[in-house]
């Protein structure tokens, strides 16, 4: 049954998204435009994401640090491409208390300048390398158009910054982190992704190249979900980050950075959500099971407590809804919040030592013996995780197209948008021409080679790259 507080996806996808954010108590608007309040349900998802990703990073040898939120203007401006790329989005502090500052301070839009300046002071010889650091923090970028989780003026993220003795090692790190993100999205968020290299126009300001993770939402709109950048020696030369190598000579370091944000929560909503609300993959759900006593009797509560204890002992996150609301309200609340499995404990079923299990993704119900709840819940959680991924993969496959001409691209984007595979000559003019079709942009280059017969989708000249194109959030 459709949740009356939520606009249907078919009616208005954008309104549906906003309704789910509110109905599931993920976030609220603040009194400053573009800034949101993370409510407990939303922040709990971010905490779960943090926990899993942090463990993955540490397995690879990364350590967490924290650098200041303020960046002196002169420091930010040292790398010209970086400041040029972020200048329109930087928020500045010009006074402290009642005193004007001698130099403006930028709220960090990203921290390459701070990390480079830090590495300049702590890296002396090749023995100090590599440094593999990550920080969890907030960032401020003065976006023109904002939407909760997808584009906010303040967002939470992790940004990894590493420094190496060789280009080979730094490039290996860039690729390693891209693959780490891909694994996280597919294994934990149950979101299939496409990975590749950004074009020169779309790469991170100051990077030699950018690798990207791209996901497709239910409505065929693309979401850049994580990026990994190789800087070469650009930042090292700008910030004088040098080390004494094994030949006892000074050499500039090689750097990378990589990041992902609370935008992932938006991806979860738009990839898995339905007209009832949020649908969370079990591996990332803060609460995997909701236990609902149909009546608040001692007998039913005793069974609920026993089930809750058994699930907890087996590392399944569950809770009992003991609120004074009706059972129907509790069911609907668990649904809108995306709890993967619901256990309904009622007096009639209990007479036969049975309870009802309900899976969130399909609403299918099954009656099981009370002594078989654990095994069945474990089975359901695994199956839901796999089913959500496969459903999202099916949507991605059904919305992935091949295009040979601009007319093909226009027809796709105007009817049923998605990922469009099309060859490209590499010229900026052709990339800009694609943008005239409903804002279509290159998502990533997935192949570069000496093509014999393939031609550019725009100009018809010999192609250099195979590119995935799409309309983005």
Name these PLM-found stretches.
Residues 1-473:
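NTP/phosphate- and nucleic-acid-binding module
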């Amino acid at each position: 049954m459709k949740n009356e507080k939520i606009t249907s996806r078919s009616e208005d996808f954008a309104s549906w998204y906003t309704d789910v954010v509110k109905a599931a108590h993920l976030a609220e608007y603040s009194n400053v435009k573009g800034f949101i309040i993370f409510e407990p349900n939303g922040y709990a998802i971010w905490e779960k994401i943090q926990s899993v990703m942090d463990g993955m990073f540490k397995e690879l040898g990364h350590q967490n640090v924290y650098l200041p939120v303020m960046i002196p203007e002169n420091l930010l401006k040292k790398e010209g491409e970086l400041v040029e790329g972020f200048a329109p989005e930087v928020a500045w502090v010009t006074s402290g208390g009642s005193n004007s500052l001698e130099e403006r301070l930028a709220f960090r839009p990203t921290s390459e300048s701070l990390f480079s300046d830090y590495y300049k002071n702590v890296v002396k010889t090749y023995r100090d390398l590599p440094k593999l650091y990550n920080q969890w923090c907030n960032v401020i970028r003065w976006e023109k158009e904002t939407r909760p989780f997808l584009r906010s003026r303040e967002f939470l993220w992790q940004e990894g910054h590493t420094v190496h003795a060789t280009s080979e090692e730094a490039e290996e790190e860039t690729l390693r982190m891209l693959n780490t993100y891909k694994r996280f999205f597919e294994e934990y968020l149950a979101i299939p992704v496409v990975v590749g290299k950004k074009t020169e126009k779309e790469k991170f300001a100051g990077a030699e190249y950018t690798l990207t993770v791209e996901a497709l939402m239910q409505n065929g709109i693309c979401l850049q979900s994580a990026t990994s950048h190789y800087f070469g020696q650009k930042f090292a030369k700008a910030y004088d980050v040098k080390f004494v190598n094994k030949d006892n000579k000074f050499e500039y370091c090689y750097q990378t950075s990589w990041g992902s944000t609370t935008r992932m929560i938006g991806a979860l909503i738009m990839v898995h959500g339905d007209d009832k609300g949020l649908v969370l993959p079990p591996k990332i759900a803060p609460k995997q099971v909701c236990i609902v006593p149909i009546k608040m009797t001692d007998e039913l509560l005793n069974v609920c407590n026993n089930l809750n204890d058994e699930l907890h002992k087996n590392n399944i996150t569950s809770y009992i809804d003991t609120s004074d609301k009706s059972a129907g309200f509790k069911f609907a609340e668990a649904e809108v919040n995306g709890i993967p499995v619901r256990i309904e404990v009622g007096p009639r079923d209990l007479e036969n030592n049975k309870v009802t299990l309900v899976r969130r993704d399909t609403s299918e119900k099954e009656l099981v013996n009370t002594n078989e709840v654990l095994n069945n819940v474990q089975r359901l959680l695994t199956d839901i995780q796999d089913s959500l991924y496969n459903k999202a993969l099916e949507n991605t496959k059904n919305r992935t197209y091949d295009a040979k001409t601009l007319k093909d691209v226009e027809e796709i984007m105007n009817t049923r948008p998605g990922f469009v595979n099309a060859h490209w000559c590499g010229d900026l003019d052709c990339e800009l021409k694609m943008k005239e079709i409903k804002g279509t942009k290159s998502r990533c280059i997935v192949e570069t080679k000496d093509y014999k017969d393939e031609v550019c989708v725009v100009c018809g000249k010999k192609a250099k790259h195979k590119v995935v194109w799409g309309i983005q959030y």
